[in-house]
Amino acid sequence: MTIAVAVKRLAHGAGLPLPDYATAGSAGLDLLAAVDAPVVIAPGARALVPTGLAIALPPDFELQVRPRSGLALKHGIVIPNSPGTIDSDYRGEIQVIVLNAGTEAFEVTRGMRIAQAVLAPVSRLVWQETDDLDRTAREAGGFGSTGLDFPMGN
């Protein structure tokens, strides 16, 4: 399935290709850094990386901004609010919050594939207030209450 999305290239994004899928089976498009000069992110520091793009999503869709696994594994570069959500009514520039969780400074350069974006449908809920909820085996257990080990059946 393909969905048409209007995209506006901002002045500082000129000369960069539009985000694209790296392979035919890729779920995410690679977002490129539209920085004019290299941005050095120290260990433990964050930076807001521009993409040089603004979009108009169709209603009932969002664009999820996610980390790239290679950057996370090799350099400790993560997106702390992952997945970041670009709402269908947002028209500003797509920017990526990047955190260096690694041990060495990381340099973001122009055109670097800094994150990936996945188009996703959005369902809207309608609250149905009640005095009673159905019972479950788990009940209110959370925050690790199911343990770390996978239960092995006999």
Swiss-Prot record:
Catalysed reactions, as listed in the record: dUTP + H2O = dUMP + diphosphate + H(+)
Single GO BP term: dUMP biosynthetic process
InterPro entries in the record: dUTPase, dUTPase-like, dUTPase-like_sf, dUTPase_trimeric
Main EC class the enzyme belongs to: hydrolase
Residues reported in the UniProt entry to bind substrate: R68, S69, G70, N81, T85, I86, D87
EC numbers on record: 3.6.1.23
Chain segments annotated as transmembrane: none
Functional pathway: Pyrimidine metabolism; dUMP biosynthesis; dUMP from dCTP (dUTP route): step 2/2
GO molecular function, one term: dUTP diphosphatase activity
CDD domains per the UniProt record, alphabetical: trimeric_dUTPase
Cofactors named for this entry: Mg(2+)
Keywords: Hydrolase, Magnesium, Metal-binding, Nucleotide metabolism
Domain of life: Bacteria
Pfam families recorded: dUTPase
Protein family according to the UniProt entry: Belongs to the dUTPase family.
Function: This enzyme is involved in nucleotide metabolism: it produces dUMP, the immediate precursor of thymidine nucleotides and it decreases the intracellular concentration of dUTP so that uracil cannot be incorporated into DNA.
Protein name (database record): Deoxyuridine 5'-triphosphate nucleotidohydrolase
Species name: Acidiphilium cryptum (strain JF-5)
UniProt gene name: dut
